[in-house]
UniProtKB/Swiss-Prot annotation:
Its EC number is 3.1.3.-. PANTHER family: 4-NITROPHENYLPHOSPHATASE-RELATED, HALOACID DEHALOGENASE-LIKE HYDROLASE DOMAIN-CONTAINING PROTEIN 2. Transmembrane segments: none annotated. The lineage of its organism: Bacteria, Bacillati, Bacillota, Bacilli, Bacillales. GO terms for cellular component: cytoplasm. Its cofactor is Mg(2+). InterPro entries: HAD-like_sf, HAD-SF_hydro_IIA, HAD-SF_hydro_IIA_hyp1, HAD_sf. The keyword Hydrolase applies. It comes from Staphylococcus saprophyticus subsp. saprophyticus (strain ATCC 15305 / DSM 20229 / NCIMB 8711 / NCTC 7292 / S-41). This is Acid sugar phosphatase. Catalyzes the dephosphorylation of 2-6 carbon acid sugars in vitro. It holds the Pfam family Hydrolase_6. The gene is nagD. Keywords: Hydrolase, Magnesium, Metal-binding.
Amino acid sequence: MKNYKAYLIDLDGTMYKGNEEIDGAAQFISYLNNQNIPHLYVTNNSTKEPEEVASKLNTMGIVAQADEVVTSALATAEFIAEESPGATVYMLGGSGLSNALTAQGLVLKDDEFVDYVVVGLDEQVTYEKLSTATLGVRNGAKFISTNQDVSIPKERGFLPGNGAITSVVSVSTGVQPVFIGKPEPIIMNKALEILDLDRSDVAMVGDLYDTDIMSGINVDIDTIHVQTGVTTKEEIEKKSVPPTYTFKDLNEVIKELEK
């Protein structure tokens, strides 16, 4: 396997499952740190701030700094701020998204007369919130969604994800949003911009083909699939565009890198 100069790394299913570290995750990050190889954690989670994500990883023994975390909320806020500085926004979502938006100088409003409607995962979503978002889009606001994951794994099972909430507004208005998170290029290009390396020197590491591996393929970087999450080795073998590599787990990746 090629030795890359930097890595983009998925979290759920790659680094951890729920609140438990996946075997090999801490060792993989330790290896990268010992070799002074830069890496970023790229997550579609818009509800958490980078500090919270890093704290969770550190609690599991996986070394992480807040500035190594790229969330769909951060990428969304930067996308809007670059396109329309100081724009007004109506949003669905948590503090991770609201803080990211205001940090970029965007103005949050609680009505449908705005420049942008942004939908992020909102665990307190209501009919009224969906109605305001729908009216905002109908009024001409640009429609943005942090990510298109229709379901998310929780202790109870797979629960509705942000893609499911987004679809309510999309179906009602007939307007398709601009998606920011994986597998879309927007969040990946943001992460690559931070690394500032040639794309041939960067690899994406993840477990889910449709999200993680496709995110790498969509921005022309190599991909490393680990069989510790959703997509199995058997499913990978059936893909018309396979990942560059597939491994049982991150321990196998370390062994390859140490050769």
